[in-house]
Amino acid sequence: LPGVTRQASATLAEQSNGRFLLGLGISHAPLVEGLRQIPYEKPIATMRSYLKTFKTSPYTSIPPNQEPQCVVAALGPQMLQLSSDYADGAHPYWTTPEHTNQAREILGKDKLLCVEQKVVLTEDKQTAYSAAKSALRIYASLPNYRNSWKRLGFSENDIDTASDHFIDSLVAWGSIQQIEKRINEHEKAGASHVCIQAIPHDGNFKIPEWETFEALAP
């Protein structure tokens, strides 16, 4: 319901004094149809229609000082272009600095590009790979991610076996300095903001990796 989202985002923006950023995503057919039991329509057309309705929906309560910005979960060139045309930018997930560079070219210089980067703060390769593969497992079967990775040059075998090259390209691990280097690569490629997702060594995402967040904080 775009109207409900519009009202909620305006309320949150007003309550947070402009710190709220709305993120919208079309999700994945196996999750939408399998888990939520609703039809998965054409992604581009569905998101375009949603954003158009969202922008024209009324909001009559106390207005925020400025309209909340909206970014779209985008991987492929068409969704990235839509993010530029109908939203304030994009929020790519499970990508590389190479993808960030490609996304910036499509979005243009003035749009938000808030990329996500998974990190494992450890210099032990076995620990890092084990944690990365645990995080990857649920995503590797989803077509949208597989297609995105293949566009970046990874093979089916890279994805299915979680090859060293695949893990090293998608997950920043090592010392603080090594992880910061990857973050800097995204920024040089055009990222407006790099969102850190810290992968726990034991795979337990219920407990935040505060040590990692503190170490990488600006």
Region roles according to the model:
Residues 1-218:
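Active-site-adjacent structural elements that line small-molecule/cofactor binding pockets in enzymes
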